[in-house]
Amino acid sequence: MANYPDFGGLLTRLLDYRQTDIAWLASASGIPDSELRSMADGVPPSASQVDGLAAALGFHTADLFVIAGFPVPEALQPCEAAAGSGLVNLIHVVMALPADQRTHIHETVEHLPQLPRIRPADPPRAFYRGDGGLGAMLVTMLCANRNLQSPINAAKTLHLLTRGRMYLAATTYGHIAAGTVPLRPTWVGGFATALGIPAADLAAITGTDLSEVTPPEDPLAAEMAELLWDCRRLRASQIEHVCAEAEAMLVPVPDDASCDDWNRVHHQNGTWWGAPRRG
C-alpha cells in the first residue's frame, strides 16, 4: 500500500504512547523479544504474530491485520456483505431504546446461531481498498471489518455514533481511503468512536494530535460500536430479524412529550414512534 508506514513504525508509536516497551509486549504476547525487535525494525509480522499481538494490545484481530497492511483472512471477515445495508437502521433504533431493552437486543444478537458465510457471485465494490495509506486503513476497518460496505452507510453511522459531531459526504470517505485529503483530528476522533478503539490509541497510530478535539466520553456510543462489531457475524436475514424486534419495542410518542424525556425514531401516519429516556 503506497504511502503506508511499515507496521513496526506504527507499533512503536502505540507502545511509546502507552509508555510500554518491547519487553512488556514479548511477555504479554508470547512472541520472542528478538522477533518483536525485528518487527519494530521493519520486518513484517506473520499471521500468527498478528493474532498474538492483537490479544496483547487489546485490538480485534481483523483490525490489526488492516493496521499491519495485510488482507483480512476469510475466516475473520463478516458473514455476509449484503447484511451491511440493515446495520444503520438497527443502530438508529437501538440507540433510542432504554438500557434494559438495549440489553435484550445485545442478548438476541449474542444467541443467534453462526451460519455459514455467504460469498455473493457479484460482491459489492470495495471502494475503500486503495493506496491511501492511513486513510485507507481507517475506512477499511469501518466499512469492511464492520460490514457497513458503502460510504453512505459509513457516513450515516458516524453521524449517529458521534451525535452529529461528524457528518461527511459519502464521497469524502472515498477521498479519505484514496489518501487525497489529509486526515483531520476530528475525523480520527470520529472513526475511533465508531470503531470502538480508544481515541488516543488511534491518534498515536495515525500520528494525529487530538489535544484540541478529544472526543467526549459516550458510553452509549461505545455500546453501539460493540453492537456493530457483534453483528458482523450475522447474515442479512438475521439482522432484519433483530431490527424488527427492536422496532417492535418502539411506542407512540405523546404529542406533548418533551425532547428531554423521549427519543424520537421515525414519523409514520402523523405519529412519532420512539422510546422514553430511561437511561
Question: Where do the model's predicted regions map?
Answer:
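Residue-level signal for the short linker/turn that defines the boundary of a DNA-recognition helix
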Residues: P5, G9, Q19-T20, P45-S48, ...
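A short, Lys/Arg-rich alpha-helix, primarily the initiator
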Residues: M1-D21, E107, Q114-T157
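Recognition helix of helix-turn-helix/homeodomain-like DNA-binding domains
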Residues: G30-P45, A54, G69-F70, H159-L183, ...
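Residues in the helix-turn-helix
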Residues: W24, E35, D63, T172, ...
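Interfacial/linker helices and their anchor residues that mediate assembly or domain coupling
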Residues: P73-G130, L210-G279
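Short alpha-helical "recognition helix" segments of helix-turn-helix
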Residues: W24-A26, L53, P151-L161, F191
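DNA major-groove recognition helix of helix-turn-helix/homeodomain DNA-binding modules
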Residues: Q49-D63, R184-D201
